Amino acid sequence: MRLNTLSPAAGSKPSKKRVGRGIGSGLGKTGGRGHKGQKSRSGGSVRPGFEGGQMPLKQRLPKFGFTSRKSLVSAEVRLAELAKVTGDVVDLNSLKAANVITKNIEFVKIVLSGDLSKAVTVKGLRVTKGAKAAIEAAGGKIEE
């Protein structure tokens, strides 16, 4: 077997549809576009969301809300995820190194969810009451 003798299995590569090449091809004359109308023309189609001049649904519905800039740089971390951090000190950089949070996160709050198996020292992160109790029960401590 050589590279120049390789060929695809028979029937695995159907031939491309060639439109407008005579009535015998089955796609001659109108080329599968039907007769007349906007969609039969070259470049003739309406943009997505266009409703024929009627006020589009997107514009009929009211605007509401916004995306808080603070939420883009804030994250909540579960207690169970602290196990992924190597070492016993948990801070912003160690969470990023363990891929628990993304690099653009600046503020982290640790929440009570799951179990904490090892004693850890939490530095410079916000902690909920329940999470604080669980960390201290596991033999860890919280430093501001």
UniProtKB/Swiss-Prot annotation:
GO terms for cellular component: cytosolic large ribosomal subunit. Keywords: Ribonucleoprotein, Ribosomal protein, RNA-binding, rRNA-binding. GO terms for molecular function: rRNA binding; structural constituent of ribosome. Residues 21-31 have a biased composition (Gly residues). This is Large ribosomal subunit protein uL15. The keyword 4Fe-4S does not apply. Part of the 50S ribosomal subunit. Belongs to the universal ribosomal protein uL15 family. Binds to the 23S rRNA. The keyword rRNA-binding applies. Residues 1-58 are annotated as: Disordered. It comes from Vibrio atlanticus (strain LGP32). One of its GO terms (biological process) is translation. PROSITE patterns: RIBOSOMAL_L15 (PS00475).
